């Protein structure tokens, strides 16, 4: 059992839970999770397996007044930190509420639910950003957290850039960042600063709009994301930005201003990118003309199949082609409505 001292760990009621044990941070992350770690302490394995077989555990933090949400912790298999009143009983239905007071301004309410398969604990806190950082400090100390994923909605009263800087200044890597607020429009400087704080994330989703005329350095853009990049208002993304993402696995650009000619040039460049990691490209393109996009390239017609609500269906003739890179890697080029899709085999 872990019993952190008050001199090394911020004051927080979590350490009062009797079966809290520390282990290494699991590297694999899934979107919308803040911390992923494993609880495998020998002294709790037998008890937990008896109570919850193959159970996942998830804790979520919601700062409701700012529409800010961060979730942390999903444990596959055994669970060991649900608290005395939960772990001391064998029951098919586990519900409970705990309230911890962190300081004069911050209270944390934990609500436990067990639906027979998954036990979830939801943490509700006041809107102060500092409260989130206090929880981060605590869990970083207890679990030696190295990576975090965050999700938040842009708010004029909320300084997202300062929050992201504060997280990184704690020696924690921003792994997945989800920035919601589809109808929010940011000034160019604010949008740029936000992007700059997220350049080395594995996954990034940016929903807010930025004013027309916004420009962003291609050299900075090339560092974005090893896994997934999604930009909802991508009118500012040029074909040079797209080409620079050779090491990002999947790119989705909505409301883009890329043209058929741009994509023709991009495919020519991609066919020369030996060793590039880029696997999937999904672009919203106005007046999409696939024959113009593949004009002058070496291609073969391919039968395209897509899945939808009605099951699988074939794409119309001329809406799916196959191209090959110089290193032998093949990719399928297709269109669905106004969406251009490239999928590497």
Curated annotation (Swiss-Prot):
Keyword rRNA-binding in record: no
Keyword entries, A-Z: Developmental protein
Matches recorded under PROSITE patterns: FBOX
Source organism superkingdom: Eukaryota
Keyword Disulfide bond: no
Gene Ontology BP term (one): embryo development ending in birth or egg hatching
Residue span, F-box domain: 11-55
Function text: May have a role in embryogenesis.
PANTHER family named in the record: F-BOX ASSOCIATED DOMAIN-CONTAINING PROTEIN-RELATED, F-BOX-CONTAINING HYPOTHETICAL PROTEIN C.ELEGANS
The protein, known as: Skn-1 dependent zygotic transcript 15 protein
